[in-house]
């Protein structure tokens, strides 16, 4: 088994421990079949500054916002007794106009004190009923419903229709995004990798969920692009961190929660905030000073600042390390670009020790290639690559939301060893590696076609 994703699905399934069947859960769980109404009179594709969908893809739905709030208010906490006995049953709209049912439990991405101050910002974890392989996360805020889930077809995105308020939402397959900005660049320096000492890193994330306290700051420019108030910026941050967790939990068993005083890091005036808004390098040192001063060095595990600089920069392997753990920033010119979470995931990957995996040298790939981990052709396609940003070397226009095997190894090494094991906390999930029976050994002549069956 070389993929930790397969095993984590077993953990997500632990909600149902002790339950004989899905029917038993349905008997005590309210449904949600009337929440969404297909709006065929609206175009599913809305032109944006840096985003297009394939023609004829996606669908637009009108949500019964009050009914959804009422339904989700009864969702049990994910690690409580009722999460296993009676998760809330939720219907999710699909890009083809149909719907799919999923179990839903409350899964906060804020520390308790912060959550008490912002009760209107709610986040949830999803697990499929009709499709048991479906996993993802959903947020409900004054900005509407935002959800990302992965099933057998890939990642689906549900978000408010741009410019149409919190009632109309579009849903589409992420593979139908066909155009990105094309000029985003990660400036993280890549020092030579020391020679490997031999052996292998951890094969999976095991039965442990690793939780890190994230101090997430916002420049005045970023806040202005997200409503201009602390409340509106906090809503955008919660949506972002929830989407980030959908990736990191599935890939490496890591979760991020916003620290108790995170709202102190949201600045609303670009003229008076402590940041040089258009200088990525300056932002790193400024953010380290700001987070240490306002949050306290002992009260967070990693820090990050969101800006309007069109690029990212982070200290490699900075998580948990005093003096450098908040030296990271991500920015983008188009504030509502759904690809923004890709870039934040990329920079946080650097904070855990992951390096660039692309092999291209043209466009923004030039000067940023890391010889020690250049496994992917051209711009690459995974999260630590440069998909869509290496003009002349692009193999596709947006990242696939998973890490290359080398990145998985680097991040898991960073989380279970140095430096990530020095902070954060762990939650036992009860997850176990699957045991597969493939039958007794067989010897067949070379070149013989065969079909392999296994169970477990």
Specify the residue positions occupied by each region the protein language model found.
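Extracellular (secreted or membrane-anchored) zinc-dependent metallopeptidases
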Residues: 204-456
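Positively charged n-region of N-terminal signal peptides that target proteins for export
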Residues: 1-5
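Bacterial N-terminal signal peptides
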Residues: 7-18
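A residue-level detector for conformationally permissive "hinge/kink" positions
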Residues: 10-12, 89, 98-99, 118, ...
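Zymogen propeptides/activation segments of proteases
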Residues: 19-281, 429, 454
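Positively charged, low-complexity intrinsically disordered regions
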Residues: 6, 38, 171, 328-330
